[in-house]
Amino acid sequence: MLCRNSHANDMKRNFYGFNLLGMFCRTKMENGDRRIFGHFPEDRFQWMREWGFNFARLPLDYRFFVEKDDWMKPVESQLVKLDEAVSHGRRHGIHVQINFHRAPGYCCNPPVEPKSLFLDPEPLAAFTNLWSLLAKRYRGIPNGELSFDLLNEPAPVAPYGATPEGYARVARAALAAIRAADPDRFVMSDGWKWGQLPVMELHPFDSLSGESIHCYEPHRVTHYKVHNPDEPGPCPPWPPEGCVDGVEWLERNFVEKWCPAIEDGTFLHLGEFGCHQVNVPHATYLAWLEDVLKMCRRHGWGWALWNLDGTFGILDTPRTDCEFEDFHGHKLDRKALDLLRKYKT
């Protein structure tokens, strides 16, 4: 599809920032996760702008926005909170990207959805209805200020029965619903297998769409002791043993998977990357972080750190092996922030 307004190519410049988890998971919020506020505080947008960033990805849980017993019935009072986030972004010069981290019938994290987005008609109807609603709601906002990212990390997670072909079918249905309401909206699609591989079934992408990459490689470093707290041995080093250049390791083990998308000119953005802060030594984390940022600079990719607040972020992380700076009553990892600022251009 050719661009049809002056804003259509605004996404072709790079965006750098953070994932904001304000409405990320209703279950976690109800269980006391302090990263999930049930809304998006304006101060986060203000701070990002003060630091020089221009992008916020909002991974959402659909359960905030529809009635529990009727997925087709939106909850206006909750949608207003999303309106506020979009307004915060526009006010502070932060591009907002809306993403469904949990969609009707799919999430890569527990709890399991009662039906499958890829196999059952009801979740697909609810999913496309949500995107149609948001496309109508935000029609007219320039692509430089707002974009959509369809579904977080499609993957062969049991029991949903997802395949690349099945995901492509769902993505096309959602894209059609969006374009019917707002033909010029820029739309991203996450890569297959948790954002690790291009979905070639969706290629070639048109000028109003692109693919979102997620980098948590090597997983044994970024998620050290996350899934197995009793994992023996120290955190693996970075760069890996036998490798003197971490960027080259990432090129061989991560970027090469994306060569088909790079070669066909697809717009790519690193929508998630990060490292769990609890057990990974700070020096290891900073070395890994800088190499991922160098990789992105080499390829001209924008990026969004997972996340701003909490276990993967730079505010109020649970680590105990670094000096924190007091920042408006929060613990700020200044060294990590300085690295991010260094590589945001």
Regions inferred by a protein language model and the residue ranges of each:
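Acidic-and-aromatic substrate-binding clefts and catalytic sites of carbohydrate-active enzymes
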Residues: 34-39, 64-66, 72-76, 155-158, ...
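Surface-exposed, active-site-proximal loop segments in enzymatic domains
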Residues: 26-34, 62-79, 104-122, 156-159, ...
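Short, solvent-exposed turn/loop segments enriched in Gly/Ser/Thr/Pro and often Arg
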Residues: 21, 59-62, 100-106, 191-193, ...
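Acidic/histidine-rich helix-loop elements
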Residues: 20-40, 68-73, 116-119, 220-250, ...
